[in-house]
Amino acid sequence: MTQEGRIIKIAGPVIIAEGMRGSQMYEMVKVGEDKLIGEIIELEGDTATIQVYEETAGIKPGETVERTGGPLSVELGPGILGSIFDGIQRPLENIKALTGDYIERGVDVPSLPKDKKWTFKPTAREGQMVKGGDIIGEVEETSSITHRIMIPPNVEGKLTMIAPQGEYTVLDDIAEVETESGTEKIQMLQKWPVRKGRPYKKKLDPDVPLVTGQRAQDTFFSVAKGGTAAIPGPFGSGKTVTQQQLAKWADADIIVYVGCGERGNEMTEVLKEFPELEDPKTGNPLMDRTVLIANTSNMPVAAREACVYTGITIAEYFRDMGYDVALMADSTSRWAEAMREISGRLEEMPGEEGYPAYLASRLAQFYERAGRVTTIGSEDKIASVSVVGAVSPPGGDLSEPVTQNTLRICKVFWALDASLADKRHFPSIDWLQSYSLYIDSVQEWWASNVDPEWRKFRDEAMALLQKEAELQEIVQLVGPDALPDRERITLETTRMIREDFLQQNAYHEVDTYCSPSKQFEMLRTIIMFHRNATAALEKGAPAADIISLPVKEDIGRMKYIPEEEFPARIKEIQERIVKECSEV
């Protein structure tokens, strides 16, 4: 069995090599004299088709292809949090120290620091029976997160040795397990192939909302922990800011942010902002619980596929520890475009708009790895991976294949609308096009943790927004003054819902995050105004007087009231609504 093949054909990121008999699908190889990292994606006879994750310019036929014998894998262990990796888990800061501002081809840097010592604290005893997923020790990796050291998924047996508390590197043996096939030495470092999902005991119903602090998402289009959401929208509609808001404020324990084929300056913004931001829950830097994977548009196309899988594998690893993880992929369209390019190089039959026929199944494989699960191990830990994928349809056309296939898989659809963004309505989530299929699942949580009437108020507000859309056609023809008074009150209420509730300023220190109880009280106040105004109208009050009530100014400003002052101030506003409406 030869361990080396020879290049016979090169087409951009795709290379065909002969003499590769005995290799396996998705095996990792090192291509050419520069030892560029690649992955076998097709085997026929003794020829292998390889996609290369680095720039292939300058490689020539006849150069060697060296097999590694294993699939493309990520290294999992202390040192992941707070790091910035490229698509194949090479730490960018270390590469910069080695090669300067530009990544040189074939640069080989260990994913995790091998010489750094971590303080290991054992939590298991010698002699106890352990199996995959059991926690045997802890490492204080950052000020926010304790890294739990687990037995690898495929190991089961008796713990014969565990290291005492002390300083160890990720390669030091910290435990030994006596299995049926011999003694397994356990290190803090684990390797896992990126294309294979990590195992779990069972999937659970997603019935706990992922609270994001964004009113439009939480109240109207909730995503559950372990759920999947898609954010399609044209250029400039606010996809990246929406993703960054979720990364900052979502109540997940760990955030994995994958910049997949987006512009370099957007990733730079994340890299500059996140280290300065404070985690609202702990007061520590937000980077302490974040992993960034940067694979910008000027990096090699093939690595986009790897970066999405790298991100989800890291997310599953932290899920297995018992943490709730949120993964932001920005943007899955760039990954689909990479698939289209490689499919074209392979001369495969194109599907719709040139995308490969397997586009839907690849997207599904990725999103299906999200979920709220009972993790493997002796203890039943409940943890989740929630995935939010941005989609950038060319020209904002939501009927294109990537958006349509994503919609079939995801249960939450936050449609961003360019016309709303042009009106400076942010987040520009179109309340008529968007939907969430988790509303029925999460209403129990809202009822028991916030208010039993949450669903009633939410549905009433949605019905009013639908009614406004119907009335808009008449308004455009004859103007608002020609409408009956009841309809004018409806239009005024929906204007308040749009401007005072749905609009949210990501850069305002108070309005950037809105707690579930504040969201509910704000919505209740607006609906309360509508009900009292309608009652006043029926008693004969003129619509013009109701619309110009002074309390409306306070309703408009309620989103800027700090959380600690909010309960008292909102009560006062609600009392004024009742008083002013009854006195009209």
From Swiss-Prot:
CDD domains xrefs: ATP-synt_V_A-type_alpha_C, ATP-synt_V_A-type_alpha_N, V_A-ATPase_A
Catalytic reaction(s) noted: ATP + H2O + 4 H(+)(in) = ADP + phosphate + 5 H(+)(out)
Alphabetical list of Gene3D superfamilies matching this protein: 2.40.30.20, 2.40.50.100, Bovine Mitochondrial F1-atpase, Atp Synthase Beta Chain, Chain D, domain 3, P-loop containing nucleotide triphosphate hydrolases
GO BP: any one term: proton motive force-driven plasma membrane ATP synthesis
CC per GO annotation: plasma membrane; proton-transporting two-sector ATPase complex, catalytic domain
Membrane topology qualifier: Peripheral membrane protein
Annotated residues for binding of ATP: G233, P234, F235, G236, S237, G238, K239, T240
Primary location: membrane
Annotated SUPFAM superfamilies: C-terminal domain of alpha and beta subunits of F1 ATP synthase, N-terminal domain of alpha and beta subunits of F1 ATP synthase, P-loop containing nucleoside triphosphate hydrolases
Molecular function, one GO term: ATP binding
The entry's keywords: ATP synthesis, ATP-binding, Cell membrane, Hydrogen ion transport, Ion transport, Membrane, Nucleotide-binding, Translocase, Transport
Top-level EC class as recorded in UniProt: translocase
Subcellular location: Cell membrane
InterPro entries: ATP-synt_VA_C, ATP-synth_a_Xtn, ATP_synth_asu-like_sf, ATP_synth_asu_arc, ATPase_a/bsu_AS, ATPase_F1/V1/A1_a/bsu_N, ATPase_F1/V1/A1_a/bsu_N_sf, ATPase_F1/V1/A1_a/bsu_nucl-bd
Source species, domain of life: Archaea
EC number: 7.1.2.2
Description of how the protein assembles with itself and partners: Has multiple subunits with at least A(3), B(3), C, D, E, F, H, I and proteolipid K(x).
Purpose of the protein: Component of the A-type ATP synthase that produces ATP from ADP in the presence of a proton gradient across the membrane. The A chain is the catalytic subunit.
PANTHER family for this protein: H(+)-TRANSPORTING TWO-SECTOR ATPASE, V-TYPE PROTON ATPASE CATALYTIC SUBUNIT A
Family, similarity comment: Belongs to the ATPase alpha/beta chains family.
Protein name: A-type ATP synthase subunit A
Organism: Methanothermobacter thermautotrophicus (strain ATCC 29096 / DSM 1053 / JCM 10044 / NBRC 100330 / Delta H) (Methanobacterium thermoautotrophicum)
